[in-house]
Amino acid sequence: MEESRAYLELHRSRHQDTLYPLFFRESIYGLACGHGSIFVENVGYNNKFSLLIVKRLITRMYQQTHFIIFTNDSNKNPFMGYNNHFYSQIILEGFVVVVEILFSLQFCISSLREFEIVKSYNNLRSIHSIFPFFEDKLIYLNHESDIRIPYPIHLEILVQILRYWIKDVSFFHLLRFFFSYYYNWNSIFTPKKWISTFFSKSNPRFFLFLYNLYVWEYESIFLFLRNKSSKLRLKYFRVFFERIFFYEKIEHLVEVSVKDCSYTLSFFKDTFMHYVRYQGKSILVSKNTPLLINKWKYYFIYLWQCHFDIWSRPGTIHINQLSQHSFHFLGYFLSIRPNLSVVRNQMLQNSFLIKMVMKRLDTIVPIIPLIRSLAKAKFCNVFGHPISKPVWANLSDFDIIDRFLRICRNFSHYYNGSAKKKSLYQIRYILRLSCIKTLARKHKSTARTFLKRLGSEKLLEEFFTEEEETFSLIFPRTSFTLKRLYIGRIWYLDILVRNDFVNHF
């Protein structure tokens, strides 16, 4: 119980009571201007950023009517001469920097402490590190549940989550003001615009932080109940959702379950259960009976309804048998397939053939969604026939080839873990012919005539030789190991985000 108390109790040293004065410091906005992110695009107003604008903005904020820069109905503020939304963006960026500094270290430390991955943290940051884990664990499990994290969440719930970490009242007034302003300005946080809200081009870091905060709160409760509360009865878990004095309620309920109950429900006692999430999709795999994983299904539904006030139907969580179902995760189709092998055993003058069936994880490249993504990017049509890229025809030959090669390398890098390379070769073929047709379009010729003019069809052979050249730096070019690796699965642990074309499906 002491461990549970230490886990849940919010220590006063973590509370931040003086965040609001940071919004009046010029260094915060300078940091916001120079602080980029690999996950979001440039919002476009950094070019307009200047120290003079920040000084004027801070001077205006010191006045009692500083929020007139937001409430003015005109497009440009008469005091400063700039668009009102531009100034709200500057303050919002400073707001995001303050909360990112506050929570980034806490999230990192709690994750490292929970999963004990301090030494190998750099490698496990890769999203491809999950696939070797799947190869080792999924073959021993029976059931898989696809969980789509529901949305939208009420804005006040986000404020309540932050209240457990921050005690600055002025900070929350400003946060509620941002919610109200952007809700009225863009009609955001509606069900139809949830994705465009949290990954908005105008406010990507702010809404991405809020979304991560929401997911972190939901997973912290889930993991705590999974790891620490194996003796609690199912009918009591609704009262856990008030975070204040959480550990006291758990202590009381443990005593009740021990004294008044002659048995313990095995709801939380699944030692062969694994939970994986990337962005808004989660996967729960288990070895136990369907009844147990079905209980977890309704646990998630009640958690979202009671703690986050989000209505989620039972049909949104699907439970499937791994032996009969393939699921989609991080751009791959994953399935468990039996692998039949025959072993000849000879004893004295008698020989026997022993058939062994072992399970293995199949990782397949989803060719149809990828062709759809390539067609959307104008590299081919909907049937997969390569076409030229007209918008690149004005570039130099070197730039055209370099852009196509970069895309092809990203595909090869991301999908080199596929068990079957036929689909990957098809994607390379589409990109290779699209590059040739783009070059032919630039030189006002056909693809066939363009290749004949060069006198050889070895043009762009890098599309097919990159992996072989990479492996030849480690193994001899004629070695069996090189050939086996070239056709086998290789997981790269330097991939931190999904491929751009994978994000389209």
Swiss-Prot record:
InterPro entries attached to this UniProt entry: Domain_X, Maturase_MatK, Maturase_MatK_N
Gene Ontology BP, a term: RNA splicing
GO molecular function per UniProt: RNA binding
Highest taxon of source: Eukaryota
GO cellular component annotations of the record: chloroplast
Annotated localization: Plastid, Chloroplast
UniProt main location, coarse: plastid
UniProt keywords, alphabetically: Chloroplast, mRNA processing, Plastid, RNA-binding, tRNA processing
Pfam families: Intron_maturas2, MatK_N
Functional summary from the UniProt entry: Usually encoded in the trnK tRNA gene intron. Probably assists in splicing its own and other chloroplast group II introns.
Listed HAMAP family: MatK
Family (UniProt): Belongs to the intron maturase 2 family. MatK subfamily.
Name this protein carries in UniProt: Maturase K
